[in-house]
Amino acid sequence: FLVVHLRMTGQFKLLEKDVLACTHTRVRFFEENGRELRFIDIRNFGQMWHVPYSKSVSEIVSGIKRLGPEPFSADFNSHYLKEYLKTKTRSIKSALLDQETVAGVGNIYADESLFDAGINPKIKSKHLNKTDLNKLCNSLTKILRISIGEGGTTFSDFRDLEGINGNYGGQAWV
């Protein structure tokens, strides 16, 4: 099977036959009926891995073993954060951006979540108490749910599969 990391600008487009490929088309998959699935990536940051059925994803995809829990998983909670961050001297914003702390959180959602939770992004991670971390977990999942519902955040060239901009940016506080 195929594992894909879109990174910041990667996207898939399903097109009818006879549509010319744009200059940022990186991979093309052809269907028997002539339609085509294209991986398009303006910045060329996206990655693809072929994972044979005889292997695990973590054997092939570099770095996947180091990823922290997903924000919507049961493993991501204030207890986990308290234990993970108890010795960390870096700022909480820096910790949120580290994919080993929590997977998939980028700059916009770290800022929004910290603002929503009322936490100064510069505070050292180890100084946050359980109440702060509970607020942060709740804020992060809340902000991500809202953003997903709005189609994400478009700040330059992000589009969904229909070519539509994400609308979360208009609601952002930061």
What are these language model-derived features?
Residues 1-174:
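Structured catalytic/nucleic-acid-binding cores of DNA maintenance enzymes
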